[in-house]
């Protein structure tokens, strides 16, 4: 898919990886709906992007992605404003082991809800023109993390859901591709959450273990993750792909064996 002229919706777009995604999409000629719960950060992000790009290229919508009605209203507003939707990036996420229900609602449930809303608008069988959905996971979605079991579970869920939904979308000839990104530690505000008891709960005493992991794996910068996003969008052959981004190997992909049933039906 060529990005130029397309309309993208990015959740968690006001800061960090989400903002890097928005900038990369705008540089490629897309129009971008900036969706974030943080009103102040969202307004500041929109203003900063307006200085670099034409103001009509972006739209900021405050939304709590864990609120189903707000999320539905947000999709409707984006399509009403821009007239279409081509690219969806479910990026909003938190790290909170203490309030673990919140973590699952934001990290996993909102991704599933957003994906189905995206399919409602983009699927060819619903009158859409096709498109692409990118769901943000993590290396924690591919490996165990003792100090963050709920965060880890939410990210594993994204990987399994995205791979399965990609197969379903292809089976239905929806014209929509689905892929996920699994980066290592990224230089965002989430890294600061490991210092706080209200985030880590019973695992706060192990924060030094996480710091040791960060030193071992290194820290990625958001623009590299945005490069991965553009790759997934522009390569029409990628569907159900799980992109890994690490300091040691850069952008690469997780290998999976074909299931016996898939092998039989191919």
Curated annotation (Swiss-Prot):
EC assignment: 1.1.1.141, 1.1.1.-, 1.1.1.232
GO CC annotation terms, alphabetical: basolateral plasma membrane; cytoplasm; cytosol; extracellular exosome; nucleoplasm
One of the Pfam families matching this protein, by short name: adh_short
Keywords: Cytoplasm, Disease variant, Fatty acid metabolism, Lipid metabolism, NAD, Oxidoreductase, Prostaglandin metabolism, Tumor suppressor
Protein localization: Cytoplasm
Catalytic activity: prostaglandin E2 + NAD(+) = 15-oxoprostaglandin E2 + NADH + H(+); (15S)-hydroxy-(5Z,8Z,11Z,13E)-eicosatetraenoate + NAD(+) = 15-oxo-(5Z,8Z,11Z,13E)-eicosatetraenoate + NADH + H(+); (11R)-hydroxy-(5Z,8Z,12E,14Z)-eicosatetraenoate + NAD(+) = 11-oxo-(5Z,8Z,12E,14Z)-eicosatetraenoate + NADH + H(+); lipoxin A4 + NAD(+) = 15-oxo-(5S,6R)-dihydroxy-(7E,9E,11Z,13E)-eicosatetraenoate + NADH + H(+)
InterPro entries in alphabetical order: NAD(P)-bd_dom_sf (IPR036291), Sc_DH/Rdtase_CS (IPR020904), SDR_fam (IPR002347)
Active site annotation, chain numbering: 151 (proton acceptor)
Positions of substrate binding: 138, 148
Principal location class: cytoplasm
Binding site for NAD(+): 12-20, 36-37, 63-65, 91, 151-155, 186-188
Tissue-wise expression: Detected in colon epithelium (at protein level).
Stimuli inducing this protein: Down-regulated by cortisol, dexamethasone and betamethasone. Down-regulated in colon cancer. Up-regulated by TGFB1.
Phosphoprotein is among the record's keywords: no
Keyword match Hydrolase: no
One example GO MF annotation: 15-hydroxyprostaglandin dehydrogenase (NAD+) activity
Disulphide bridges, residue numbers: none
Listed GO biological process terms: ductus arteriosus closure; female pregnancy; kidney development; lipoxygenase pathway; negative regulation of cell cycle; ovulation; parturition; positive regulation of apoptotic process
Noted disease: Hypertrophic osteoarthropathy, primary, autosomal recessive, 1: A disease characterized by digital clubbing, periostosis, acroosteolysis, painful joint enlargement, and variable features of pachydermia that include thickened facial skin and a thickened scalp. Other developmental anomalies include delayed closure of the cranial sutures and congenital heart disease.
Function statement: Catalyzes the NAD-dependent dehydrogenation (oxidation) of a broad array of hydroxylated polyunsaturated fatty acids (mainly eicosanoids and docosanoids, including prostaglandins, lipoxins and resolvins), yielding their corresponding keto (oxo) metabolites. Decreases the levels of the pro-proliferative prostaglandins such as prostaglandin E2 (whose activity is increased in cancer because of an increase in the expression of cyclooxygenase 2) and generates oxo-fatty acid products that can profoundly influence cell function by abrogating pro-inflammatory cytokine expression.
Self-association state and partner proteins as the record states: Homodimer.
Family the entry assigns: Belongs to the short-chain dehydrogenases/reductases (SDR) family.
Protein name: 15-hydroxyprostaglandin dehydrogenase [NAD(+)]
Organism: Homo sapiens (Human)
Gene: HPGD
């Amino acid at each position: 898919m060529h990005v130029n002229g397309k309309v993208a919706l990015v959740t968690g777009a006001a800061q960090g990886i989400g903002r890097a995604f928005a900038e990369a999409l705008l540089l490629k000629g897309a129009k971008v709906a900036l969706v974030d719960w943080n009103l102040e950060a969202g307004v500041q992000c929109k203003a900063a992007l307006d200085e670099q790009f034409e103001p009509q290229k972006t739209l900021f919508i405050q939304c709590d992605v864990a609120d189903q009605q707000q999320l539905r209203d947000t999709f409707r507003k984006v399509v009403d404003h821009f007239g279409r939707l081509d690219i969806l990036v479910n990026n909003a996420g938190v790290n909170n082991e203490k309030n673990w229900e919140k973590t699952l609602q934001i990290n996993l449930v909102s991704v599933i809800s957003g994906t189905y809303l995206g399919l409602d608008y983009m699927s060819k069988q619903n009158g859409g023109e096709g498109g692409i959905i990118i769901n943000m996971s993590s290396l924690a979605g591919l490996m165990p993390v003792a100090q963050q079991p709920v965060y880890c579970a939410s990210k594993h869920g994204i990987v399994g859901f995205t791979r399965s939904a990609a197969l379903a979308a292809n089976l239905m000839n929806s014209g929509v591709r689905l892929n996920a990104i699994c980066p290592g530690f990224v230089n965002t505000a989430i890294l600061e959450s490991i210092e706080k008891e209200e985030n880590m709960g019973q695992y706060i005493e192990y924060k030094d273990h996480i710091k040791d992991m960060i030193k071992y794996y290194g820290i990625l910068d958001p623009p590299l993750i945005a490069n991965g996003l553009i790759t997934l969008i522009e390569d029409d052959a990628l569907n159900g792909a799980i992109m890994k981004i690490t300091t040691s190997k850069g952008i690469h992909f997780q290998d999976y064996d074909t299931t016996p049933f898939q092998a039989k039906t191919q």
